[in-house]
Amino acid sequence: MMNPLIIKLGGVLLDSEEALERLFSALVNYRESHQRPLVIVHGGGCVVDELMKGLNLPVKKKNGLRVTPADQIDIITGALAGTANKTLLAWAKKHQIAAVGLFLGDGDSVKVTQLDEEFGHVGLAQPGSPKLINSLLENGYLPVVSSIGVTDEGQLMNVNADQAATALAATLGADLILLSDVSGILDGKGQRIAEMTAAKAEQLIEQGIITDGMIVKVNAALDAARTLGRPVDIASWRYAEQLPALFNGMPMGTRILA
């Protein structure tokens, strides 16, 4: 079996039917013409935010990471492992793709520990066992994995989806693409940066060009590139016609170098 490709979905993608239609059409085309197995990892911040707003619960973020108090983890689990995950499975079904919905704890695929008490139920992801997902891939399934994990003590944890995708890529020896709302990392003039090293990233963070959630994304990608020993792509889901080329390893966004 070829080494898998993990496609991490993020941003408002889950909120846009048009975007999901484009993405799944590209996935169908890719699966028809290539033998390479695919895995989807997703967060669903927009789904969570909508739910929290509807329940009048405050959304608190610290250094770009969502703080998850004990009284909110059940709600966030429901939004990510429930609504967001099953929405993606429904789209797969609509496109005749045999998909299986998972969370990080299934088959111990990704090990999760609590990041820090001050973040509450926020988990740190580490590589786990490839057995379950490899078995699904060998049988032609598309695993769709939410970024909810569980600790050895049985505590549910909300994991940053970029970091969850990195840990799963390390588990499977997979390549990784982080798909988001932006077409890559932009410089101070709004132009896409084709390649990024750790030194360049540090410089842009110091200059205030890379900020907030993008810092988390860039650090996750740098961490992924270092962990995996291969480049990681940050790209946009908005340009469906470019997705098959991107899945084939053509750089379309910002390529993060190890």
Curated annotation (Swiss-Prot):
Which biological pathway?
Answer: Amino-acid biosynthesis; L-arginine biosynthesis; N(2)-acetyl-L-ornithine from L-glutamate: step 2/4
Q: Which InterPro entries match?
A: AceGlu_kinase-like_sf (IPR036393), AcgluKinase_fam (IPR004662), ArgB (IPR037528), Asp/Glu/Uridylate_kinase (IPR001048), NAGK-NC (IPR041731)
User: Which keywords does UniProt give here?
Assistant: Amino-acid biosynthesis, Arginine biosynthesis, ATP-binding, Cytoplasm, Kinase, Nucleotide-binding, Transferase
For whether the record's keyword set contains Kinase, the answer is: yes
Keyword rRNA processing annotated? no
Q: Which GO CC annotations does the UniProt entry carry?
A: cytoplasm
Q: Where does substrate bind?
A: 44-45, 66, 158
Q: Which reaction does it catalyse?
A: N-acetyl-L-glutamate + ATP = N-acetyl-L-glutamyl 5-phosphate + ADP
Q: Known EC number(s)?
A: 2.7.2.8
GO BP: arginine biosynthetic process via ornithine; L-arginine biosynthetic process
The entry marks the following residues as binding ATP, namely 181-186, 209-211
Could you tell me what this protein is called? Acetylglutamate kinase
Q: Could you tell me the gene encoding this protein?
A: argB
